[in-house]
Curated annotation (Swiss-Prot):
Pfam families: YL1_C (PF08265). InterPro entries: INO80C/Ies6, Vps72/YL1_C. PANTHER family: INO80 COMPLEX SUBUNIT C. It comes from the Eukaryota. GO terms for biological process: chromatin remodeling; DNA recombination; DNA repair; epigenetic regulation of gene expression; ethylene-activated signaling pathway; positive regulation of gene expression; regulation of ethylene-activated signaling pathway. One of its GO terms (cellular component) is cytoplasm. It comes from Arabidopsis thaliana (Mouse-ear cress). Belongs to the IES6 family. Proposed core component of the chromatin remodeling INO80 complex which is involved in transcriptional regulation, DNA replication and probably DNA repair. Together with REF6/EIN6, involved in the epigenetic chromatin-dependent regulatory mechanism that monitors the expression of the essential multifunctional plant stress regulator EIN2 via H3K27me3 repressive histone demethylation and histone variant H2A.Z eviction, thus modulating responses to ethylene (ET), especially during embryogenesis. The INO80 complex controls ethylene-induced H2A.Z eviction dynamics. This is Protein EIN6 ENHANCER. Keywords: Cytoplasm, DNA damage, DNA recombination, DNA repair, Ethylene signaling pathway, Nucleus, Stress response, Transcription, Transcription regulation. Component of the chromatin remodeling INO80 complex; specifically part of a complex module associated with the helicase ATP-binding and the helicase C-terminal domain of INO80. Interacts with ARP5. Transmembrane segments: none annotated. Expressed ubiquitously in seedlings.
Length: 124
């Protein structure tokens, strides 16, 4: 079949005009593949942090002052934001359903929840 095409004097273009250009023809290959984003672990290993003095600020030991905003009040039972506090038990709660649960707790359980939050009252 190839011999017949050669003898027929048919000229076939190397690239047909109706075909779209491929992406690799439009955009040349990137100049350097060595410029890539580095992960934090790679940066930390490259910096040799143990050799640096401890007062020098780095990624690892940046010291910041305490926050000026008050900490969020979270529900002691569910962990959601708690706009309410039970005056009898001093536990924080998020909604009415949790309030019923708070009221049904024994005094030992209430004391355990308060000790988790470091708000337990110690009587001497």
């Amino acid at each position: 079949m190839e011999r017949e095409l050669m003898e027929a004097d048919i000229v076939v273009a190397s690239r047909l005009s109706f075909k779209k250009k491929q992406a690799y023809e439009k955009y040349p290959k990137a100049q350097s593949s060595s410029r890539r984003w580095k992960h934090l672990k790679q940066i930390l290993q490259a910096e040799n942090f143990p050799d640096l003095p401890p007062d020098l600020p780095t990624y690892v030991n940046i010291e910041s002052p305490p926050s000026t905003q008050p900490c969020k009040r979270l529900c002691d039972i569910t962990g959601y934001e708690a706009p309410y506090v039970d005056p009898r038990t001093n536990l924080r709660y998020a909604n009415a359903h949790v309030f019923q649960t708070v009221r049904s707790l024994s005094s030992d359980q209430v004391h355990q929840y308060l000790s988790i939050r470091n708000a337990a009252v110690v009587l001497k």
